[in-house]
Amino acid sequence: MAGKRKTMEELREPDGTGESCRAYFHLPGLFEFYDLYQVFLPLFKKHREYFYDWCEIGSIYGAPADCLWGGGRVGGGEHTPEEALALTQEYGISARLTLSNSLLRKEHLTDARCNQLCRVFTKVQSPQSGVIIHSDLLLKYLQEQYPGFYYVSSTTKVLTQFSQLENELRRDEFQFVVPDFRLNKNFDRLRGLQPRLKDKVEFLCNECCWFGCADRKKCYEAVSRRNLSSTEPEFHCKSPGADEGYRFSRAMENPGFISVEDIQNRYMPMGFSNFKIEGRGLGSALILEFLLYYLTKPEYQIHVREDIYLDNMLDLF
């Protein structure tokens, strides 16, 4: 696309009051849930009255299958990078590559598949593509080779101390920083951040991980090893409820959970505007539930279900 590249700052709409007038949601599954977004995004555009007027889709993030630089979750999906990028470009949404492998070494930087992926996504002019990243080694490499990206500091760094978050927010390399979900309700410290730092905070809203988990970093490292095709033993989570897998109802009971009401009544009035929804490793039905809960007015949720999948001949059993 021709023309001047728009940065994420230019896509925001400050209202001049210190409060955020928009909440930007960063959604999972750029590759993994392409088919869902192919149906949902036209609906979001055509029937804007179904959705909260204070929210926008800030980005869709993910990684394709067999992505050596990937992290957080193992990527997937059957669509090409070109198709995934074209879909987000059609609707004016930033595409983010999740390249948050924490165990990369210098020899991994020459991976042909990952470099081609970056060449595809860095070509676009507007909106700008981003990279969610953990490794400083990869960050330096991408800055040198693909200067068109903006960067998001990954939650896989597990920044659980507020001083760590503050230091990360002050790094000029990052346009956004996703803190560990256990800092979500540290309102006294969050309220005291400078406005320019508040603009960079991207809260992880719907984490289901046990709030007291001490192995979160080990879990992410296990995913990084899997993406590197390591033969080391798998990590097995021993946290309470881990054997049940992800349940949105349990996530809502998590002390770090951020509800729609929290966003409207606490975070936006404090000047925060960026909210990440996790879910790349889940099923598309659950992703739809997230879209209904966070973006859709309650009275229109049935309309969205009907437009996407629900008809009078659908059998569940």
Regions found by a protein language model. Give the residues of each.
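Active-site pocket-lining/capping segments in soluble small-molecule metabolic enzymes
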Residues: A2-E168, E173-F317
